[in-house]
A protein has these predicted regions:
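Cytosolic regulatory regions of ion transport systems
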Residues: 1-226
Length: 226
């Protein structure tokens, strides 16, 4: 049973979300708002009933059984998000069942590094740590002068921060922030205006907000000067 068979009027990609806790529900609802066709799966009847109020395709099923997933046509989905977190056994068995069903790309939520390692070894192509990522983000916002912070797996980060005093009234080329701090200013926003892409000729004014990218340690050091 495949709810999203290929056809001229159907989406090019299909996505299934397994586990409809807070994280899974947020992922499924966000994907739906973005215009994607989403199949949501959970084994708890009360959760399925509640999710049916906001999602079009919701199925009650035991995702740890590969035969059940095969019946749902899970192997024909382009992406499957395993959003089961606290029940580690169910999380691992679901990833294994997805792998056995031939899912091409498996995203899985992990609650810690050891859980993530097991998921990778079981067949997950991508592992995310939403609680850790949010904790890291909030820690940077609370302890530093950043307005926003996003870190990637490879030690690369993007931050939103106020313009440092040394750059005000100068072009980015004149202030030489890149050579001094090893970061790249990719966008500048004046109060009340939209962000614009930064160039060496962009003039930084007092009150401007900068979008800066670079190695995590370098953008942290740069943000501390603002």
């Amino acid at each position: 049973m495949n709810l999203f068979g290929r056809g001229e009027n159907l989406p090019e990609e299909t996505i299934a979300v397994i586990g409809l806790g807070r994280f899974g529900s947020a992922v499924a609802e966000s994907l739906t708002r973005l215009g994607h066709e989403v199949l949501a799966i959970d084994e708890r009847p009360e959760i399925v009933q509640r999710a049916s109020e906001t999602l079009t395709h919701v199925v009650q099923a035991d995702s740890t059984e590969s035969a059940v997933l095969v019946q749902l046509g899970i192997g024909e989905f382009d992406h499957v998000v395993v959003a089961i977190g606290t029940d580690i056994e169910a999380s691992v068995l679901t990833v294994l069942a997805c792998e056995e069903a031939g899912v091409r790309e498996i995203w899985a939520k992990a609650i810690n590094a050891k859980h993530g390692q097991i998921l990778h070894r079981t067949g997950a192509h991508h592992v995310v740590y939403p609680e850790w990522a949010m904790g890291e983000r909030v820690a940077h916002l609370v302890s530093g002068r950043m307005l926003d912070f996003i870190e990637f797996d490879d030690g690369f980060a993007i931050v939103k921060t106020k313009a440092p005093t040394e750059a005000i009234g100068k072009t980015l080329g004149e202030s030489r922030l890149r050579s001094k701090y090893g970061v790249t200013v990719v966008g500048v926003k004046q109060p009340g205006e939209d962000f614009t892409y930064a160039t060496p000729d962009t003039v930084v004014s007092e009150g401007d907000t900068l979008i800066v990218s670079g190695a995590t340690t370098k953008v942290e050091a740069f943000a501390s000067t603002t």
